[in-house]
């Protein structure tokens, strides 16, 4: 999580050259092929996983990169038939309303002809062959009969008519026997139910995979934070930082490593800003490892992986930050400290403006009463966003996000059945987060220009560069 202080290795002060020189691809390579973001971003530590098994169940990918929010329906059945309910009684429906394919060539069947469902073309072909007693030149190639080539090999077409059950003794034009229709409908419903069960199982598996990756990769989550904030933790309560004196005490104990190497001699606002950056860098690394657990992410072009992280990490950070916040303050240093909201507001400008918008967002976000399983899918949807600038494989990323958003929708329906508007509310929060990150990036640029002692970490500087 984004604790204001954390126990990680100290960062030495940055020189002017670090701030002004552009971080090119060469710099990223010096960081170990973007190892600064992740020690193994090029490795698929999650193992091989075919994202295609979580196919999009919606009405089709959006062309503008927006999130698909319309009602999503099960994918079409792999069988040759699908049932479309129509008005009227079952007896009134013809075989055409069942949208059945011709058993011979796959074209749309016009009815039940000579004992099988067949199109007008194959019905006429079989009738002519029988009535005229036509004999075709033998073919040993076992030609595949399809709509586009059904007239090329008449011998194989006739053999397929016979093998699929067409018979002159079973003449019946147009109408299907009621028993046959009832049997067919039962088969269709069974197939659809089996398919839906399979799809639901796949979606649950995806949700479980993402949730487990979330719990594994982040050192702080909502359930842990709520236990600490409620005073129910088994260990000592967090140390409260509410003024300069308690801040200095915390810097000597909780975050002593972060304020070494000359940082301790700078003013309090700069020290706090430095600690915020340290925690942000750590969370970017956690988010990168989490992203690699999202099916399909590690198979993306490396440029697309970096782009998704560049534009998505701060939106994800501020969403997860809400978990450690309440109206009075926020947990820091892995839950060992609690810095008050009023103290952060008392800092001099522009530093006093950093956290207050995050508290405002957190109060509204926490009102949705999401748990970690909800948040994990929400964060995954943020990362896999197909409208980020500079993406190469937009279509694949959009399909990834559509699948995750669909899983999120179904998960919310199951996890929060009484809040029917929770899903659209959460989609709106994605837009709110973009605005929050834009304002934050603008404030950071102001600090960079006006505060000579408040140096930016190189990784965060690269993330902010040309962001918005």
From Swiss-Prot:
Gene Ontology CC entries for this record: nucleus
Region (Disordered): 1-20
Ranges that cross the membrane: none
GO molecular function: DNA-binding transcription repressor activity, RNA polymerase II-specific; lipid binding; nuclear receptor activity; RNA polymerase II cis-regulatory region sequence-specific DNA binding; zinc ion binding
Zn-finger (NR C4-type) residues: 102-122, 139-161
Database matches in InterPro entries: 1Cnucl_rcpt, NHR-like_dom_sf, Nucl_hrmn_rcpt_lig-bd, Nuclear_hormone_rcpt_NR1, Nuclear_hrmn_rcpt, PPAR-alpha, Znf_hrmn_rcpt, Znf_NHR/GATA
Annotated segments matching region Required for heterodimerization with RXRA: 304-433
Keywords: Activator, Biological rhythms, DNA-binding, Lipid-binding, Metal-binding, Nucleus, Receptor, Transcription, Transcription regulation, Ubl conjugation, Zinc, Zinc-finger
Boundaries of every NR LBD domain copy: 239-466
Site (Essential for heterodimerization with RXRA): 433
Location within or outside the cell: Nucleus
Matching SMART domains: HOLI, ZnF_C4
Modification comment: Ubiquitinated by E3 ubiquitin-protein ligase HUWE1; leading to proteasomal degradation.
Function: Ligand-activated transcription factor. Key regulator of lipid metabolism. Activated by the endogenous ligand 1-palmitoyl-2-oleoyl-sn-glycerol-3-phosphocholine (16:0/18:1-GPC). Activated by oleylethanolamide, a naturally occurring lipid that regulates satiety. Receptor for peroxisome proliferators such as hypolipidemic drugs and fatty acids. Regulates the peroxisomal beta-oxidation pathway of fatty acids. Functions as a transcription activator for the ACOX1 and P450 genes. Transactivation activity requires heterodimerization with RXRA and is antagonized by NR2C2.
Summary of subunit composition and partner proteins: Heterodimer; with RXRA. This heterodimerization is required for DNA binding and transactivation activity. Interacts with NCOA3 coactivator. Interacts with CITED2; the interaction stimulates its transcriptional activity. Also interacts with PPARBP in vitro. Interacts with AKAP13, LPIN1, PRDM16 and coactivator NCOA6. Interacts with ASXL1 and ASXL2. Interacts with PER2. Interacts with SIRT1; the interaction seems to be modulated by NAD(+) levels. Interacts with CRY1 and CRY2.
Protein name (Swiss-Prot/TrEMBL): Peroxisome proliferator-activated receptor alpha
Organism: Phascolarctos cinereus
This protein's encoding gene: PPARA
